A protein has these predicted regions:
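Entry/capping segment at the start of metal-dependent catalytic domains
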Residues: 1-31
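Amphipathic, coiled-coil-like alpha-helical scaffolding segments used for oligomerization/assembly
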Residues: 56-118, 166, 183-192, 199-204
Length: 373
């Protein structure tokens, strides 16, 4: 839980604050594996007597207890323990460790997150680690900023774990004892030290699996929510419960050099195929495909091509079957290059910015014209 208790936070109710980040963790001390699944804070959830709301509101309404209950219901798994930390505590942990070594995927310029970071392997201070973990707007041109931020958070958490767990037993125990002041948890210090000892030597590159909850953005009553993609989510959680990686392969965004899901392959950034060519980027986000030519099966085939890029796709018919040209429509100039990428994958089509004529809630709208064969 990355809730921030500073006065500057705009998301609070009474003396409780909304969660800034939520990660569901599975720790397997027998096989010495850990799984980190980030859950969108804006996921629309049912909180029983408190009604439907964004997931991060659970902390503001009922603190850690309601957050744990709500996440457990969403994921369909029992949750044994919880831990939460605010931004200042997170920064202090990194500084107390003498910084952590992180290979920053791309250069970050994001004043809202706290400033600038160079790309590349470096030792991050607490302030620098916080910039990496908070930045969303540095990724505006690539898509869902929350997904990239969540990936960076898991990257930093892995670096923290590596530094703690690579120490000798005595040093590790004293380090955990010292860092405990920054974390609120229902675990006893002795339990944390015992768990750390069983996980000693864990290699984040091969022993930590990670992913993001699959969702689709939707605008409901003037508010943006993330809607859980139930089937994909169930498949992911089934894999997690079996001790498998959340996804069956690494998901890599080549444009930002960010690994969005890890399977223990040892991959930290972008990579190449066996023939030396660069792997295709795996995108995040949603696309609505509309059949505007009346050709049976056109929407299905187009959807499959777009899904290969990594997008979640929803298909249906357009308002008519009279569209002469295929259109890939976006509503933000930062998405122009990605819209063209979709058109290239389809083999036809024109990427164009929405002039207000098209209504859609997804990141992109594709209308198939008669040029689609």
């Amino acid at each position: 839980d990355g809730s921030n208790d500073r006065e500057a936070s705009a998301e609070f109710a009474g003396d409780q604050f909304r969660s800034d980040s939520i990660i569901l963790a599975r720790i397997d001390p027998v096989d010495k594996k850990a799984t980190l699944v980030s859950i969108h804070r804006d996921t629309l959830v049912d909180m029983g007597e408190y009604g439907q709301n964004k997931l991060n509101a659970a902390h503001a309404i009922g603190g850690a207890a309601l957050t744990v209950k709500t996440v457990s219901k969403l994921a369909g798994v029992p949750i044994s323990h919880y831990a939460e930390i605010n931004f200042d505590g997170f920064k202090d942990i990194v500084d107390a460790l003498g910084g952590v070594e992180v290979d920053v995927p791309m250069e970050i310029d994001d004043e809202d997150a706290g400033g600038h970071l160079d790309a590349g392997l470096q030792t991050l201070s607490g302030d620098q680690a916080l910039i990496l973990c908070r930045s969303r707007h540095a990724y505006d041109e690539y898509g869902d900023g929350d997904s990239y931020r969540a990936a960076n958070q898991r990257l930093v958490l892995s670096a923290i774990a590596k530094k703690i767990l690579s120490a000798d037993v005595a040093t590790m125990a004293s380090t955990v004892q010292a860092l405990s002041q920054y974390v609120t948890t229902d675990l006893e210090i002795s339990d944390i030290i015992g768990l750390a000892q069983t996980m000693q030597g864990l290699d984040p590159a091969t022993d930590i699996y990670s992913a993001m909850e699959p969702t689709t953005s939707k605008y409901i009553n003037d508010v943006w929510y993330e809607i859980n993609n139930v089937d994909e989510w169930k498949k992911m959680m089934t894999r997690v419960n079996q001790g498998l990686p959340p996804t069956d392969e690494d998901i890599v965004d080549e444009m930002s050099n960010t690994v969005l899901a890890t399977t223990g392959s040892g991959q930290t950034h972008s990579s190449t195929n066996e023939d030396g060519t660069q792997k295709k980027a795996k995108r995040t986000g949603s696309v609505a495909v509309r059949n505007g030519n009346g050709i049976t099966g056109a929407g299905t085939e187009a959807s499959e091509r777009i899904e290969e890029l990594g997008y979640s796709v929803e298909s249906g018919n357009a308002d008519s079957f009279d569209y002469p040209k295929t259109l890939v429509i976006y509503d933000d100039e930062a998405k122009a290059s990605r819209a063209q990428e979709i058109a290239d994958a389809l083999g036809v089509g024109k990427a164009m910015k929405n002039d207000g004529s098209y209504l859609f809630e997804s990141d992109f709208l594709v209308v198939l014209g008669s040029d689609w064969k």
